[in-house]
């Protein structure tokens, strides 16, 4: 495994790998190594760890900007921000345990590379929206930078968005700059019990569209709710409010009056644990034999898909987040089906993306892990890859063909 400690070493490594005709499998914390397609073909693949780029380069709390190496653990980032009453608004999840890894080993670089975001993404935006700039080495071994360290900077602004979510297929990051924001003083969750997915989606949409500054909304079937919420045995529709205590109290009272249904309040302690568990997909961690899927759709379509899955696969585990726009699913093995449920699920998803988050390697080798792109978009993606990495040295198989 190669572990360069600076951009010059990384540049030399990329150039020598290109000359060898080999490829580099990028990672930092290695918590997400089983997400995506495994390496393919006879081409040699060398492991490239960016864990050596793990320093805090600049933190300017008053400017709401943090610059660090991509190998810095997310746990260290969160601890640093908590000291100044700040956080990353897109709520980075910890998916390591989904892959049998210890909690807390994920890095900021891995989080940005996979564009991971938690339940608050529906209102706060994605990881891509909080990435301001980066330094990197491209597939030619050239050192370059894009974006900057100020929130209003626009120079090279599109490149940070392109790199975020590229799964290390375009560049090898050496430095990242992200936007941080003040953390809320407190949190409250309104729980609406015993609703079906369709009515839950309607009320989540009402809450998210209200003037009460709702932060996130999710629907949990009874099988999921009872494992996460003490004393609950029915389905739970959850609406999160955050901010100053007096504001949260006033908004909670107003929203409860507007919704016109039975509402229970969970309190700050339960709320913090609950929303972290949903962001981390914690209810699926122990389902080791199931294939895990994450489906992004228009919020109005999530309930129907979840109900269709529940009807056809009664042993499946799943819930709605992002106000109905995100579906988490765990599918047990199905007789005569070797694709982890890909054909079944993608047949249900007409306007969205179904991503195979976890499956055995044989399934990830045979099935598109990521939603297949339309031909024109796939051609654009190939041109983008060629412009950054003409020799396909970085994670050439990670996103598929």
Language-model-derived ranges and their functions:
Residues 37-43, 49-51, 98-99, 262-401:
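Conserved glycine-rich FAD pyrophosphate-binding loop
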Residues 95-125, 129, 135:
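Hydrophobic alpha-helical hairpins/lids featuring a short glycine-rich hinge
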Residues 33-54, 69, 120-140, 172-175, ...:
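Structural signature of FAD isoalloxazine-binding scaffolds in flavoprotein oxidoreductases
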Residues 2-95:
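Glycine-rich N-terminal segment of FAD-binding domains in flavoprotein oxidoreductases
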């Amino acid at each position: 495994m190669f572990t360069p400690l600076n951009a010059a070493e990384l540049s030399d490594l990329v150039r020598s790998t290109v000359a060898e005709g080999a490829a580099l499998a990028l990672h930092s914390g290695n918590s997400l190594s089983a997400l995506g397609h495994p390496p393919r073909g006879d081409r040699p693949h060398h492991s490239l760890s960016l864990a050596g780029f793990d320093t805090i380069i600049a933190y300017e709390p008053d400017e709401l900007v943090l610059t660090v190496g991509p190998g810095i653990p997310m746990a260290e980032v969160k601890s640093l921000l908590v000291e100044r009453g700040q956080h990353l608004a897109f709520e980075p999840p910890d998916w390591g345990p989904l892959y049998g890894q210890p909690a807390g080993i994920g890095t900021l670089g891995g989080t940005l590379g996979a564009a991971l975001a938690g339940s608050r993404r529906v209102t706060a935006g994605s990881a891509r929206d909080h990435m301001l700039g980066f330094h990197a080495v491209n597939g030619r071994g050239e050192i370059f930078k894009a974006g900057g360290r100020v929130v209003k900077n626009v120079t090279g602004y599109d490149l940070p968005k392109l790199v975020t979510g590229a799964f290390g297929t375009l560049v090898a990051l050496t430095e990242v700059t992200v936007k941080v924001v003040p953390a809320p003083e407190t949190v409250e969750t309104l729980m609406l019990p015993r609703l079906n997915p369709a009515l839950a989606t309607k009320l989540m949409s009402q809450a998210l569209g209200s003037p009460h500054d709702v932060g996130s909304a999710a629907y949990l079937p009874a099988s999921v709710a009872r494992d996460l919420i003490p004393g609950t045995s029915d389905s739970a529709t959850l609406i999160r409010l955050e901010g100053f205590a007096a504001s949260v109290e006033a908004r909670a009272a107003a929203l409860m009056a507007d919704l016109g249904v039975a509402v229970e309040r969970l309190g700050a302690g339960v709320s913090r644990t609950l929303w972290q568990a949903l962001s981390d997909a914690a209810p699926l961690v122990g389902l080791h034999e199931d294939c895990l899927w994450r489906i992004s759709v228009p919020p109005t379509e999530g309930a129907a898909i979840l109900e269709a899955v529940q009807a056809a696969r009664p042993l499946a585990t799943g819930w709605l987040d992002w106000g109905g726009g995100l579906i988490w699913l765990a599918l047990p093995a199905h007789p005569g089906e070797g694709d982890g449920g890909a054909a079944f699920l993608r047949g249900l998803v007409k306007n969205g993306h179904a991503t195979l988050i976890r499956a055995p390697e044989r399934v990830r080798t045979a099935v598109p892990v990521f939603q297949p792109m339309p031909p024109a978009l796939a051609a654009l993606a190939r041109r983008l890859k060629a412009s950054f990495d003409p020799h396909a040295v970085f994670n050439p198989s990670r996103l598929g063909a």
